[in-house]
Amino acid sequence: MTNEKMIFRNRVVDKGQLRNLISWAFTHYGTARTAVMADKLKDLGFRYATRAGVSISVDDLMVPPSKRSLLEAAEEEIRATEVRYQRGEITEVERFQKVIDTWNGTSEALKDEVVTHFKQTNPLNSVYMMAFSGARGNISQVRQLVGMRGLMADPQGEIIDLPIKTNFREGLTVTEYIISSYGARKGLVDTALRTADSGYLTRRLVDVSQDVIIREIDCGTTRGIPVRPMTEGSKTLIKLSTRLLGRVVGEDVIHPKTKEVIAPRNTPISDDLAKEIEKAGVAEVVVRSPLTCEAARSVCQHCYGWSLAHAKMVDLGEAVGIIAAQSIGEPGTQLTMRTFHTGGVFTGEVAQQVRSKMDGTIKLPRKLRTRTHRTRHGEDALFVESNGIMILEPRKEGSETPAPQEIHVTQGSTIYIVDGQQVKKGQLLAEVALGGRTTRTNTEKAVKDVASDLAGEVKFAEVVPEQKTDRQGNTTTTAARGGLIWILSGEVYNLPPGAELVVKNGDRVETNGVLAETKLTTIHGGVVRLPEATPGKSTREIEIITASVVLDQATVTVQSSQGRNNYLITTGNNQVFNLRATPGTKVQNGQVVAELIDDRYRTTTGGFLKFAGVEVQKKGKAKLGYEVVQGGTLLWIPEETHEVNKDISLLLVEDGQYVEAGTEVVKDIFCQNSGVVEVTQKNDILREVVVKPGELLMVDDPEAVIGRDNTLLQPGEELLGQVATELRYIQYVESPEGPALLSRPVVEFAVPSNPDVPSTTSVSQQTGRSIQMRAVQRLPYKDSERVKSVEGVELLRTQLVLEIEQEGEQEHNASPLAADIELIPDLEDADVQRLQLVILESLVLRRDIAADATQGSTQTSLEVKDGDTIVPGSVVARTQILSKEGGIVRGVQKGSEAVRRCLVLRHSDMATLNISAKPKVKAGDLIVAGTELAPGIFAEESGQIVGVKNAGESTTTQDAALSTQNYAVTIRAGRPYRVSPGAVLQIEDGDLVQRGDNLVLLVFERAKTGDIIQGLPRIEELLEARKPKEACILAKRGGEVKVVYGDGDEAIAIKVIESNGVVTDYPLGPGQNLAMPDGSVVPAGQPLSDGPSNPHEILEVFFSLGSEDGVYACASHALQKVQTFLVNEVQMVYQSQGIDIADKHIEVIVRQMTNKVRIDDGGDTTMLPGELVELRQVEQVNEAMAITGGARAQYTPVLLGITKASLNTDSFISAASFQETTRVLTEAAIEGKSDWLRGLKENVIIGRLIPAGTGYNTYDEPGMLEDYSTLETTSVLDETDDPLDMVLDDRTARAYNLDSPGLAETGFNNRRSILDDDELIADEIHDLVEAEVEVDDEVDDDYEDDDEDDDDYED
């Protein structure tokens, strides 16, 4: 070690410095020693952290004292804006934007204030030290602790214009706390969604690039890609030196001034060289890149450059594809997912503010093209249409005049001063829109509704409404011209439906005067019944009985069983009915009220029903039964049916056998009647057993009796020698004893045509509906229906049905009529209850609401008493609407259908000023606050002048000259609202509005934040090569732009005129804005409108341009354009989030997306149209064709997204393990594909050693490599006696030939053994082994050669 003095550098080593230090150590001294150094640094850090004991206490959070004044200034500005809004100078949207921008500005200013405050007062403050050394926390967190939290977005992404003014040190108010938790929740949800997305992206990336391995040293290509610094507007995002670091020069780099070669071709660019190139001012450098590498299915060392992990040339066999995929996928989590549609708020960053550097005068040159323009804060400004300059002439300072300053303004900038205006130092002159991409920030249409702040009548001033009808026939009214909408104050009353006004325009009403009244009338008339007003609730309902029916002879008794009440009705002739509808409920027309209880029609078993003379109504639901129309007889043939589902083995009787009652027919089932058994079975499963009672008559000749099957035998008829005494039913059966006839008994039930109805008395209004009870008989079964049952069934039911006659009622009541069932005590005998059915018309009285301000107070009076009989159409009650305050009635529209609102102009709505001077205003003028009414007198509030009276008229003429005149000016309060052109009007001139009614929908454009789809979704869109939603229009050929304007000043189309005079038209869709001004010259592929470009279209445009050098050159050129586009766009997204990724990683991925072409025509090759083949492969085949004279294959380059590319890879094993396994494998099997196992994934799946790293060359010929030590940079190991030197680095060890000399030969160094061969193997067999090894090698060689040939053939 030399005796030089140590140099002490007085610097703070922050995170960045530390990073550089460690990377330097790593590059020069290798991993092991760096690890030791890092350890020592760690110990140092911990030791001093322990000594210092830096921690945060609440006292460390120092709030800058200037915070108060900053907030006050902001509030002041907002108050001023509010006043402008009140005066109708700006719209609601402009006010909102201004408020938000003000708060954002304040928040930023406060942040800077926090920093300076810490620096000046206490640089050793622990909070400050932590945040600014990069140890913990960052400035935005500190801002929340000691500055202000700022604005938050609500769940819809709209910004809430109430900022959080406090910080966590001072504590949040409840409102602020809740607003603040909105944003926090959003962050959490976002993160949760992000991790999954990012993981999937990484998986797809790995899959597409896993087989990219460095396999050659130099592919020998002369192509390269130009590298420039990456800029956005005037801001450099990535410096040239950063982009060059670790690349290999593709063409000699020449110094622009001295013309000497700084770096010859194939030089790796180190850090120093990169800085030197940048210093020399070289604009762009052509470097070799994975995009242009010509190695087959891999990338060569020279095209890849340094492995960024060690800052050395990349090793052969390095799996650069996987590294690239991980480098792009890993930061994915840090990208924000959802864009906060924050109402165009964060676009404050977009514009750079130009402030005056000194006092002076501004001159705008004549040739500067500007137009007046209203800014988003509602201020007037000039909009610059083409690039130019403005001149600032400084004020004269003494004798010498400083030179005037030129200020450059770009197209799209906004100038805030006018020609010749005096400006002060620091005054805002202009906002320059950043050049380049941001001029095409997308805008989107958004709407905001404006609600009225006061009730009153609407008056349009300067607003020109315009009606549009869309295809659906909906009309919308929009403002063709902007202007003011005035709301002139007054009390607006909402009239209830059906109210009639009793006043007219201009009438004067006193307090509690009647404005309108509603009448409650009855439609049908009848007997009034007022339900008893229970103490708690007043009488709201009036019932009018229009019709009723009473069962006057029947008594009602109640039986309770199991907690349910059964009502039984006993009629005069002792029929008992069961009430089916409980009292107090409503009964519809045709509903059953009661059912007769009788057992006359009950059977004992199931059986078979036949009608004799009985007729039923055909229609009707089977559920309710069939109504009997004509009486007659029901014939019932009993039979007993057992439905069983059991195995046939459980049957104990035979089909056709005669059994006695009580026989067990099936296991556990006994029959109840004697008779013949009929068994139904299906698939050895017993379905049902039927026992048919009757007598069995054996037959000798079946033919003779077959006609008697299923017939009735009348009494007195003879059958087989027997005379029947009663009606029998004959059936033919096959019994076990032989053929027989079964004679079955028949039961008859008589059905009367008209059942008797209990006597009723009914009351009915002459106009109303009549109501009566009708008895109906219903049969539940059809003719010839079999009733399967063991127990008995009821064959006929007699029911009482309610019938309401509806005559001409349809228009009043669409609802079906209903009657109420009530029990009323009998008039003579109070103990007996009678059943009464009534039809009520029930009228509800309006409650008198004092609370609803818009309705005025109401007063309701009842016009009838209980028990009155009234005629239809009489008034039952009337409600009057009273005015709350006296005033004049206005705003009753004449001739309009029903008037729903009316306005009372109160005294409090008007103010009178007494003025001595002559007023400058006249009646009817609309004035805003601050207008001069008379010399020296200004209006305090906005409104309309109602009258100007001359009060001081003197009586005598000679005094007239002396007396001063007095004027009384009366102003009616009002409120103006500014409406921007194109807003949707929701009211008309002269309408009456309540407070809070919507007046207009303001339509405004807001900038979509950034490139709207930032972050992961945008990266995914690029890498999956999706077509963007609103893509821009690309110029297909170069030329001069001519803009075609439509009937507005809207651009509707763009014409591009080429140099040879060809004109191409590009129509602009809705929502597309010009990106190129009129007259500019554009190259092919240049976006003409705003929006993201469609990469497929870029490829198509450049490919269709064609080229003299044939289709291959053309395809390569087009692919290179789209590759550059993709690399830059992906970089943009990551840069916008402050994430640095080396270009080469993105290039490796993009290379995999762009190396295929689609065959259009196979020519004489073996390729089929539509097949996806690698570009280089087609080109080789085409070259072969050119030699043999065959027709070449025609193709189009394609861009595949990463998923598509993964599925189209050569290796089907890799593709199948990714997605759509069955499809990939079946296709591979049909095509008979072979997998050459070139990538990592295939080998992992099969279980071989992967061909990367140490496994590289395991399956390749060993002789390819030159000796490693020639590639090795010289080591910087110092010859010191430091114990650290015992540590050898894994990468520098090769330079020190530590292995036995025999093994340092070429070809073996990639398989270094740890121990010497001699130590492993005993001496005798050593020679033998040596010989064998050589043989192995040869075998290997041959095999590998084969493989190589295959390779070539495949290429």
Curated annotation (Swiss-Prot):
GO terms for cellular component: DNA-directed RNA polymerase complex. CDD domains: RNAP_beta'_C (cd02655). Binds 1 Zn(2+) ion per subunit. Zn(2+) binds at C219, C293, C300, C303. GO terms for molecular function: DNA binding; DNA-directed RNA polymerase activity; zinc ion binding. DNA-dependent RNA polymerase catalyzes the transcription of DNA into RNA using the four ribonucleoside triphosphates as substrates. Belongs to the RNA polymerase beta' chain family. RpoC2 subfamily. This is DNA-directed RNA polymerase subunit beta'.
